[in-house]
Amino acid sequence: MSIIEMRDVVKKYDNGTTALRGVTVSIDAGEFAYIVGPSGAGKSTFIRALYREVKIDNGSLQVAGYNLVKIKKKDVPMLRRNVGVVFQDYKLLPKKTVYENIAYAMEVVGERRRNIKKRVMEVLDLVGLKHKVRSFPNELSGGEQQRIAIARAIVNNPKVLIADEPT
């Protein structure tokens, strides 16, 4: 069964640039897929469409059981709970500790505090950075920042995990 189903998707920006032109992709649950191409090919727009940061102009798009063409604004946070994203620049919050950066992803979806503490410590253990729980992003190496971004992306047990430039 497809976890991502994109059919004839078109995305044009206001400046006239067409970022996606008739894109059709089907990705099954448990499948790994790589989107490759030169700069400006639309890879980032493709990713941003998957978690509804950008709206598509034409076509159909289903992600983790959500119809992203018809999704209501109030349902977007629940979609994003099911789509974990590791951003190219990590997007860590500089004034928050490692713990707070990861916990924030659970707080915004209304998770209980006791569940947050337990789960944050589990994912920190998983990425091997429990000892950095009180550190701030600027105190971490690039690789450690990436692992914190991964921990944040998986803390809500998403159905889909997306990594933008994962190298």
Residue ranges and their predicted role:
Residues 51:
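Helix-to-loop junction immediately C-terminal to a conserved catalytic motif
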Residues 59-67:
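Conserved ABC transporter NBD signature motif
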Residues 68-84, 113:
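ABC ATPase NBD coupling module
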Residues 99-107, 117, 121:
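Short helical segment in ABC ATPase nucleotide-binding domains corresponding to the A-loop/adjacent helical element
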Residues 136-140, 144:
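Conserved ABC ATPase signature
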Residues 155-159:
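A short, proline-enriched helix->beta-strand linker immediately N-terminal to the Walker B motif
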Residues 161-164:
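Catalytic Walker B motif of ABC-type/P-loop ATPase nucleotide-binding domains
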